Amino acid sequence: MVFGLSRAIRKAEKNAIIAELKVYSPKYGDLLKGRNPFEILRAYERAGAVGISYITDPKYFRGSFEFLRKLCRETELPVLRKDFIASKEEVERTAEAGASAVLLITRLLKEELPEFVDFAKEHGLDTLVEVHSEEELAIALQTDSTMIGINNRDIGKLELDDGNVSLTEKLAPLIPKRYVKVSESGIAGTEDLKRALRHADAALIGTALMKTPDPEEFLRKLVEVEV
């Protein structure tokens, strides 16, 4: 069974960055600003992204499941679907759309998390189990997830908090090596990235990439900077 995203991260020769195609942020509003999302996708590919992330949630992030399908057809990079997944039907739909990985939020799924992880893996999906505290990490470590993501921001506040990589610095050392460790959110530039990648295997970056006038140049700098 091919777990494309976790394998790509483990094999990465440069900094492993999952680049998020983020069209809207509850904090900053419209991030696309009239640009063609597929041109941004190509920029991410050229700059050396290890994978692509996309939020399908329509309510808070103005995403769409149909766009996820198109995205998976348009790129050979592994695609991570982010959403507030709460049903196994949504896991199945993720696999059917052609995504490589699915986000599973510990706070949302609680004791059902191990079952959801196993179900997703049976469907060939990498699982990125998201945590925001030591208590949530304890639950995540009871699963056979391929990846654990530390969300530096609080999803309960819908990214309206600032967030920084100090949570990654605190939690990542507690995660065994069998899991791929991903630092998510709150990474604004190279200094944040260096701090995150001292402890994590990869970083997921969205808002900072979408806000820059030249996503390709900025991402290339992040991929190539010495950490």
Curated annotation (Swiss-Prot):
GO MF, any single term: phosphoribosylanthranilate isomerase activity
InterPro entries from the UniProt entry: Aldolase_TIM, Indole-3-glycerol_P_synth, Indole-3-glycerol_P_synth_dom, Indole-3-GlycerolPSynthase_CS, RibuloseP-bd_barrel
Enzyme class: lyase
Pathway participation: Amino-acid biosynthesis; L-tryptophan biosynthesis; L-tryptophan from chorismate: step 4/5
GO biological processes: L-tryptophan biosynthetic process
Residue pairs linked by disulfide bridges in the UniProt entry: none
Catalytic activity: 1-(2-carboxyphenylamino)-1-deoxy-D-ribulose 5-phosphate + H(+) = (1S,2R)-1-C-(indol-3-yl)glycerol 3-phosphate + CO2 + H2O
Keyword terms of this UniProt record: Amino-acid biosynthesis, Aromatic amino acid biosynthesis, Decarboxylase, Lyase, Tryptophan biosynthesis
CDD domains per the UniProt record, alphabetical: IGPS
This enzyme's EC code(s): 4.1.1.48
Family classification: Belongs to the TrpC family.
Protein name as it appears in the record: Indole-3-glycerol phosphate synthase
UniProt gene name: trpC
